[in-house]
Amino acid sequence: MRILIVSDAWYPQINGVVRTLTAMRDQLSARGDEVYMLTPERFWSIPCPTYSEIRLAFISSGAVGKVVKEFMPSAIHIATEGPLGLAARRFCLKRGLPFTSAFHTRFPEYIEARFRIPADWSYPLLRWFHGRSSAVMAPTPTVVDSLAARGFKNVRLWGRGVDIDLFKPGHRQGTADVPGKGPTLLFVGRVAIEKNITAFLDLKIDGTKVIVGDGPMIAELRSHYPDVVFVGAKHGRDLVSYYNAADVFVFPSLTDTFGLVMLEALACGVPVAAFPVMGPKDVVTDDKVGCLDEDLSVAIETALTLCPEDCVAFAKKRSWTACAETFRSYLHQFDPTMIHGADVLSATAS
């Protein structure tokens, strides 16, 4: 199959969306599919306000169409709802091409947290965007149910995996030697308001709090929490070394759809402490590998008693190979010659 994946999220961003799409590209390519990633670096773009590492590529559906006509895919997946996703959606509708889409990020909740715009105002826009999709792929049963309750159609469960060859237990030493006393309490992720990091940092609890990641709030948090260890963004084996140095992985977010970092921590033998909300409820499904509690300090204290071996065994059941097969099964194949056909909708159709 020749698969075109359109995404506004791509390197140098490092987040769950980029990691998931990278895994899909690699897994599908390994099984013999041809995969083309249509991403912002191929076009003129500007930094996203308040998220400078995110590039917004403002292009026409014609520019997207040129790439589509050159690659001649037999399936198109629109991964994000940004400018590239909008242009690709418009091109597909004009040519009568089926496409699938995905719900990776709870943007309405993020917008509400940052700009105080009610989430209920934003969801109709996302429902419109995904309304013509053959399959709207969502990462967990909770997200599937939530979207269906909001009127989204054709929502399908598409789980997530973890690279167990990279994320695995190791020695508590090396590049991630962490100063401080007591257990090491780790957070990995974007340092931004939607991650609810202050709920973790405000806890009066024994141990050393370590923050791995970068983002718009890092300078402010460094100033307000001088006893917290901030190490910036880490990748690959450097990131793994921080997981290996941790006793508990703390995930304070209330808005994530999944949270790949929780699976990465578990694969390294680190139990998870989180709130009982969307994301953690679908990842930490066994009380042997983590604790979900409205009191995050209780969740941490409980997680400290759990067995690392149980965490590793749990994570090994989540493979990217199975995830890619599910993704591929939802794709809507079409005859590539349709790409060069006449427009079936007017320029104003949506």
Where are these regions (language model features)?
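Nucleotide-sugar donor phosphate/pyrophosphate-binding loop at the beta->alpha transition
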Residues: 98-100, 109-128
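Short hydrophobic beta-strand element within catalytic cores of glycosyltransferases
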Residues: 271-274
